[in-house]
């Protein structure tokens, strides 16, 4: 049921205008719920339950002042209390039907019908006995977004203007659907051992990451005479976390090998100079001259074999001679000559620079290792000050099947410091110790809803703003603070496509998302510590569903995409239940990425769809703060859509021609026209901006 004690969304203005200390006689008072004679058992009263009267429905209901949960029926004794038993370990197990999936009490209300529920499975596999995890149902989850009462808002310490408070939680544009329930089934798991986030720790981490980025820039400039390859530091962090076994959620500290293949490859591809795309003949001529000059300078300044020096110098002199003689060459002639020079000199130049580039990669890793130690010491000191132990006895986990639920942390969260918040037009600004992060009003409302759905240790929202600050700061530092930096690594599919995926293939879960760019309220993300409070199920590579339909749009990091394919194939191989992954990755062919090649050859591949470049869109990775006209951008490369399904998954969510046609039609609906009818994306300036955002990793360049 909707939160009866809070009223409906239509009543939000009157409810929010009534708060102690701000109401006056000229303001209308909100109707207070009538408290009935409390004839409840003493156990329920101690648990926070009381009996109230609904004027709208003209019947009694039961309200929990601790969790804000409302029920029509009297609460059942034996259900777990989220305060004393947040994980529900001592809860009385609910009776289960071996052939049916039960629905939790908080979800026994009308909700949207899902196509995946209406269609027969099409296979004879017996449905598993699936229990609903008690942890995420400790709080009532409304079937539609509703605005809470003033008392909750007042506990945030926000502006005293009640109308402004109401506006914060009333989105004007919505790019998500948090009503969709999950069909992802997992084995019940224990809480995560990562330490809970704290603004003081996050502030130190962000300062050290900025220093590490600066170290990387200086090493590239001083040792190789180049600027750091675009997004290479961001992809280094993504690639390192695939193999990292360290304690920090962001910085690597325990990796093998020490030299990152991703960082090494991208720096080497920019040596001796970065080859950019050219349009005109004179640009091609200058590029050829710069490459020859840089190759000669590098081979003379490094220790190289006499044969290597001879080959490079001879080819460089031959190129200079050709440039002096031929004044009628076309753009294609210059590019052919450049390609010939790269083939002749490239191996020798790379061999001469190899030790230096490995030194850069090793140096950055060891600096990161020292920074992680400092962050860890700071974090443990804060926990010790609050008498919180990092050593928590792991609870016993029952081996049962449950619907997926957000990550829970084993270590208790320490008290949070105060965080300031103010509004600038439609932007919410949150400040801690002079460091400010920003998020649009619409996405602030989204974070509030996700927090309300997922968080179980802060029913009064006293820690909401500090946790939002930590979340925004974490993603800001992960992808950099430059213009459009990192936005391509956080891009997501348009709303129309998500709607089609859910309607046609029963998709209800994103494998690579964040609280900021997710469409569903169930998703995997990079950071279980900051994101778990907002619905994250943890990192995708640690998430092991037994059944369900999933969308996967990974960051464009080759090592991460390759690890994703291995993970998906293991899951499809081991599960007898319907399991489906719809994967969206760039169609890079020169050379092809291992992930794309493996999926095309996989026995689980049921279909492959190619979306042409500049004929489909992504939503910006900075959608939570960017302008409306920049919300969507054209993809500058083809996108491959691959359907990986086991046999039961194929029988249930088969990519039939009719469904594929509808999915392609969804891509033809431009999100730009949806969000801004007056903006135009056909200009060359817009294409250049999109290209900057969508920049892939430095691969073998083809500057044509």
From Swiss-Prot:
Keyword Transferase carried by entry: yes
A GO CC annotation given for this chain: nucleus
Tissues where the protein occurs: Ubiquitous.
EC number(s) stated in the UniProt entry for this protein: 2.1.1.62
Positions carrying Phosphothreonine: 152
Low complexity: bias regions: 670-684
GO MF term set: mRNA (2'-O-methyladenosine-N6-)-methyltransferase activity; RNA polymerase II C-terminal domain binding; RNA polymerase II C-terminal domain phosphoserine binding; S-adenosyl-L-methionine binding
Family annotation (InterPro entries): HSP70_C_sf, PCIF1-like, PCIF1_WW, WW_dom, WW_dom_sf
Complex formation: Interacts with POLR2A; interacts with the phosphorylated C-terminal domain (CTD) of POLR2A.
Descriptive protein name: mRNA (2'-O-methyladenosine-N(6)-)-methyltransferase
Species per Swiss-Prot/TrEMBL record: Homo sapiens
Gene that produces this protein: PCIF1
